[in-house]
Swiss-Prot record:
Pathway linked to the protein: Glycan biosynthesis; glycogen biosynthesis
Species, as recorded: Streptococcus agalactiae serotype V (strain ATCC BAA-611 / 2603 V/R)
InterPro entries cross-referenced by the UniProt entry: A-amylase/branching_C, Branching_enzy, GlgB, GlgB_N_E_set_prok, Glyco_hydro_13_cat_dom, Glyco_hydro_13_N, Glyco_hydro_b, Glycoside_hydrolase_SF
Transmembrane segments: none
Enzyme Commission code: 2.4.1.18
A GO cellular-component term linked to this record: cytosol
Residue ranges that the Swiss-Prot or TrEMBL entry lists as coiled coil: none
Family statement drawn from the similarity comment of this UniProt entry: Belongs to the glycosyl hydrolase 13 family. GlgB subfamily.
PANTHER family, per database record: 1,4-ALPHA-GLUCAN-BRANCHING ENZYME
Protein's name according to its UniProt entry: 1,4-alpha-glucan branching enzyme GlgB
């Protein structure tokens, strides 16, 4: 586009590759700097090439509020900032909102960097992604904080060139299908875990270079691993050298003070109704999709973007007298529309905790157009249940079964995320009831239930081997736990469970309707046993039975819809996983008997605090 067209589309909220115009660009042997600061009294470029404030480079402003200057002295790798004279006369140093790289902390300067035009070698993956999509594919996500998965020999966070050598083989070995990273965009404080951003196009220096991350993604794709990233378009860090009140007025944030300030997180909220902000944010999302070949974006804190009263501070109703943030609603629909028009097989996932807005319904039906949303209700209910003494679980059995009332209202991801293993909530293993043996048994049971329940899957790092302590953002995982036999067996169990999930289409082929689910018994409160069948579109099925008390149940009998010879294909109490069973249940033939609405029954021993999953080895005539 011409500069005139760039400015016009930016102003109407339709410039979706804003980084091609704003920011710093190599042009005819010089570097051109452009920044949007419509109400600034003056803007200058300062940096290594101006001896910082000693020889500032004056910028000129156009009618759209964009300031521009060219430098013959600037070189790639130089540090720079904008010296902004705000409306009112205050002079502040600001980052470049469009910078693609920033200096190593504690510095906050932007870096002049020309991104390489990578010749990608992941064509097989990208072609398969386009051909097969993802809705009817297995999705089992390993959630990672790149700075604390594993430290290098000097105790520093690994860069992505190092993670390529260590994390990718681990993902492959553990049979995950995708890896999701907590924010990789530039952020000044590790304590925020990356969720208070300052650079929406800048790769976080701590983790290496943009080129290293490109190579990491390519290597993941070559190993059949998809890559997702977290992205935070609702709020941003309020540091004075970042986006906050960039030109002295509400530039990126709302003009209304209470709407601008996020009291819960000590951040500032984007003005999602402002056209220029829409161009900025949608350009950021597309940049990560296109430049890094990522396979999906998880949008953080969607509820904060949808509801005016979600925050802890004062709020005002909209023009209709209710609590909906109409600008947020329309922005999210626009975001998903733009991305799906260009990249229909990139996953858009919402972290959203309410049930009043249709998150994954299509745009034509009035939904927001996301592909998936995290099932926060299921997660809260199920963790509360598994923490409870089994003696009382029969009275709270609805915590396990309630999800079947709404499971297909949205397309869900069943997430045990980082949020559940911090701030005194305890690690996944430590949440479980009982002594050490029963804690591991409960965790195996829980993970089997997650895998068999409709919905895509996500597990935070460290939870796969039963790390005992909570996650600490400034330390690596407790890999030393794997010196313990029980943790080793827990890791082996998760690895085999992940492969079990991939191998059985019944668990992922139909995740969005009762065509893939048949409830056998959700009323057995007295024994606290839940049973259901998962089905695929070819007629195959798995019978899934969960004993949620530490009482073994010999000759447990259940109705089944298909006569046949059944084989146990998963038993969470096997000795190799840390249990006490040396052998599986024997292959078992159904009996002709009436059980509820079924004409055939299957009898077997149900392990204490265990899950037992069966497949039909041979069908018999009814």
């Amino acid at each position: 586009m011409s500069n005139k067209d760039e400015l016009y589309t930016f102003g109407i909220g339709e410039n979706f590759h804003l980084q091609n115009y704003l920011g710093v660009h190599s042009e005819n042997g010089s570097f051109c700097f452009r920044v949007w600061a419509p109400n600034a009294e003056n803007v200058q470029v300062i940096g290594d090439f101006t001896d910082w404030r000693n020889r500032p480079l004056q910028m000129n402003k156009n009618q759209a509020g964009v300031w521009e200057a060219n430098s013959l002295d600037a070189r790639e790798g130089d540090l720079y900032k904008y010296l902004v004279t705000r409306k009112g006369g205050q002079v502040v140093e600001k980052i470049d909102p469009m910078a693609v790289y920033m200096e190593r902390r504690p510095g906050t300067a932007s870096v002049i960097k020309v991104l390489r035009n990578k010749k990608w070698e992941d064509g097989l993956w990208m072609g398969r992604r386009k051909r097969l999509g993802f809705q009817k594919r297995p999705i089992n996500i390993y959630e990672v904080h790149a700075g604390s998965w594993k430290k290098d020999d000097f105790g520093h966070p690994m860069t992505f060139s190092q993670l390529k050598d260590y994390l990718i083989p681990y993902l492959v070995e553990m049979n995950y299908t995708h890896v999701e990273f907590m924010p990789l965009m530039a952020h000044p404080l590790d304590m925020s875990w990356g969720y208070q951003l300052m650079g929406y196009f800048a790769f976080e220096h701590t983790y290496g270079t943009p080129e290293e991350f490109q190579d990491f993604v390519e290597a993941c794709h070559k190993n059949n691993i998809g890559v997702l990233v977290d992205w935070v378009p609702g709020h941003f860090i309020q540091n004075d050298d970042a986006l906050a009140y960039f030109d002295g007025t509400a530039t990126y944030e709302y003009q209304n003070h209470d709407r601008a300030h996020n009291y819960r997180w000590g951040a500032l909220n984007f003005d999602l109704g402002k056209n220029q902000v829409q161009s900025f944010l949608i350009s950021s999302a597309l940049f990560w999709i296109e430049h890094y070949h990522i396979d999906g974006i998880r949008v953080d804190a969607v509820s904060n973007m949808l509801y005016l009263d979600y925050d802890e501070g004062p709020w005002e109703a909209n023009q209709f007298g209710d609590n909906r943030n109409l600008e947020g609603y329309h922005f999210l629909r626009k975001l998903n529309k733009v991305i799906k028009e260009r990249h229909p097989n990139v996953m858009m996932i919402a972290e959203e905790s309410t049930a009043s807005t249709p998150i994954t319904k299509d745009l034509e039906s009035g939904g927001l157009g996301f592909d998936f949303k995290w099932n926060m209700g299921w997660m809260n209910d199920i963790l509360r249940f598994y923490e409870e003494d089994p003696l009382y679980r029969q009275y709270d059995f609805n915590l396990v079964t309630f999800s079947f009332m709404y499971i297909f209202n949205e397309n869900f991801v069943l997430a045990f995320s980082h949020d559940e293993v911090v701030h005194g909530k305890k690690s996944m293993m430590h949440k479980m009831w009982g002594d050490r043996y029963n804690q591991f048994a409960g965790l195996r049971n829980l993970y089997a239930y997650q895998m068999c329940h409709p919905g895509k899957k996500l597990l935070f790092m460290g939870s796969e081997f039963g790390q005992f302590l909570e996650w600490k953002y400034n330390d690596q995982l407790e890999w030393e736990n794997l010196n313990d036999d029980m943790n080793q067996k827990m890791q082996r169990y998760t690895k085999q469970l992940n492969q079990f999930y991939k191998d059985h289409k019944c668990l992922w082929r139909i995740d969005d309707s009762f065509d893939g689910l048949e409830i056998i018994d959700a009323d057995n409160k007295s024994e606290t046993v839940l049973s259901f069948i998962r089905k695929d579109d070819k007629g195959d099925l798995l019978l899934c039975v969960f004993n949620m008390t530490p009482v073994e149940r010999p000759n447990f009998t259940i109705g089944v819809p298909q006569a046949g010879i059944y084989e146990e294909v998963l038993n969470t109490e096997m000795e190799e996983f840390g249990g006490v069973w040396k052998n599986h249940n024997p292959v078992t033939k159904t009996q002709v008997a009436t059980w509820k609405d079924y004409d055939h029954t299957l009898s077997f021993t149900l392990p204490a605090l265990g899950a037992s999953v069966w497949r039909i080895k041979r069908r018999l005539r009814k």
